[in-house]
């Protein structure tokens, strides 16, 4: 897909989110990313992850319980291939000998790297090497903010060299002419999306929480209530003015400097997705460009004091 998109676009940055590294040969990933960086003429962003569900790992015969160690070992090997004219490596899970990358990267030292993660170990490791982090919907905002604060602390301690990483929030989004139109058109698709995704075998685990179990309780009720989801910022929906305000609010609560929108969800028709995208591009993006957050130096959330 990215290869095709690279030849039909000129300005937009493109990227996978994510390569599930335990399921890939690191040499293949290093070469493919280098090729895509050339095809996009340096417009590539690259997302890496350890995986979100054991079902896919079972299909590949890869141990789910060792995914985190495998992912970080694979990333070390990939970066080693990018950084050296000839590279050899022997680890617990992967090895290579005298690998020469035949495709020079356009972006130096490599394309910007992203990793969605919430475990303390992975957050700190990502921050320590300057890999950007991103969070998606299922956790409540207080969990996301705590994760971002951990990331910021680790980054400030490590002060890694190179380009500064970003802190991102990803949300499903639907923009229409009015708040009512957006809610009415998106409601069934939002509910369908969570009913399908919450029970899917491939999404049997998310971070250190079981997504299916989590969605069986209070959080599932919250997410299946479209009005609650819009109010608490789990779902971005409304007129261009409302959507602009919603994104600014959740970015401020989280201390995030990047927003990723998933415009196609549920069973939305193509024309609905495109209309939402056009409204976002024409009316929301110009306003968001005026809104900036220094995510890496964002003040830490105040501790909550229980009422007595």
Predicted regions: what they are:
Residues 1-14, 108-111, 298-308:
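N-terminal beta1-alpha1-beta2 module of alpha/beta enzyme domains
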Residues 14-16, 44-48, 113-116, 133-136, ...:
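Hydrophobic faces of well-ordered beta-strands that scaffold small-molecule active sites
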Residues 65-101, 142-256, 285, 289-308:
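An alpha-helical appendage that flanks or caps ligand/catalytic pockets
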